[in-house]
């Protein structure tokens, strides 16, 4: 009786938590393969799980580890909170085919799915698992694999089998059978695994990505793939990924292309960012950005995210160190900036930072809100000072008075974001929030409040959060912007592997 009840309970839980839907695929006369994407509706349970994941992760994670690759024991991919991902598609593996729902992720490069040998991770019991013994095309590999995700890791081993994406069959594709998955992130996820579309340079175990094999084996017409993400919440169609080309009906005008500057990620250079038409000045000399389909969020340096938070009224951390810097050193900093001093060196010149040529604001806002030792306090004061210098410089370019500049900097001290977390906003103010503009390839790309604000529920029960999150990446990799679905939704995105470039056009 007990066994029957446990079996019934397991089936019931599976039915409640697994997303059951189908994704269409189509081979067209133009030689392209189109994969229909499913879109997960935003809900409070996943948003809560996302917050718990970030809270549990926070004390163990440091931005300086974000881009560490090829560790002697494990590889590192961009740290993601995949619970924020909204778009998925289906693939099959093996003969006969076994279906899996995956995120098509341009921010990583491996294909991994749960293994039937995943016994001890609860997450595996709530997702489809690959059964090697039931596939006649399976080829044993056995090479161990581990991908670290902050506080946990996906671990397992490599196997080889036929992978079908749409109508394309990639023979003997190497992929990871995950035998261990970290806690809540993958337990509540509406997908089974990840299909990475990044470059081989960041592939765990130097495994050849699925996309590379598509191109090298001549399975696609052109070495291009493109994303259209449907942002209409009332439309059942979630979007589409096209392998081998683009779908003209999903964009307007011409794409603006920029070259990939660092292979591994789809990374490129961008210009300055504007808030309500006002330049921030932070990226006036250029910043790096990554087009990342594996996240719904848009992540950038704390300095600029704080300015956005202030403009949209987002809640943040009140930083005592930041306020102390503005109060004690604000006028001195302004005098240095008026004397045309480099904002990055102002804080060392007034003695707040020990500038050694590498210190910069990108060391992170984590230190700004730390308490404890004098070393942490000094670092917090330095980071706060460097951010304030950028804010003041931005206001000086707008010919603001010294009194207004100091008041503005003090106000921003109340809106510093929590590292890598979203901020709550007033749903009633969304229509009056500013347009945020990115400069890419000499062209302006606007994001409206409807693009960057997530709304859950209706009426008095509604909750709104900003899609902008802060994460500081130290030089030489940073400062860095990660443009997720918030950006790729309004802008159709082309990933041109053949010419090493990324293109954006207004989505239709």
Curated annotation (Swiss-Prot):
Signal sequence range: 1-25
Segments forming domain Saposin B-type: 317-419
Main location: secreted
Listed EC numbers: 3.4.23.-
The Peptidase A1 domain, residue ranges: 87-505
Tissue-specificity statement: Expressed in petals, carpels and seed pods.
Example of a GO biological process term: response to cadmium ion
Keywords of this entry: Aspartyl protease, Disulfide bond, Glycoprotein, Hydrolase, Protease, Repeat, Secreted, Signal, Zymogen
PROSITE patterns: ASP_PROTEASE, PEPTIDASE_A1, SAP_B
Active site, per annotation: 105, 292
Record has Glycoprotein as a keyword: yes
Molecular-function annotations in GO: aspartic-type endopeptidase activity
Propeptide residues, chain positions: 26-69
GO cellular component terms attached to this protein's record: extracellular region
Disulfide partners: 118-124, 283-287, 322-413, 347-385, 353-382, 427-464
Keyword Thylakoid: no
Domain of life: Eukaryota
Glycosylated residues (UniProt): 399
Function: Involved in the processing and degradation of storage proteins.
Family to which this protein belongs: Belongs to the peptidase A1 family.
Protein known as: Aspartic proteinase A3
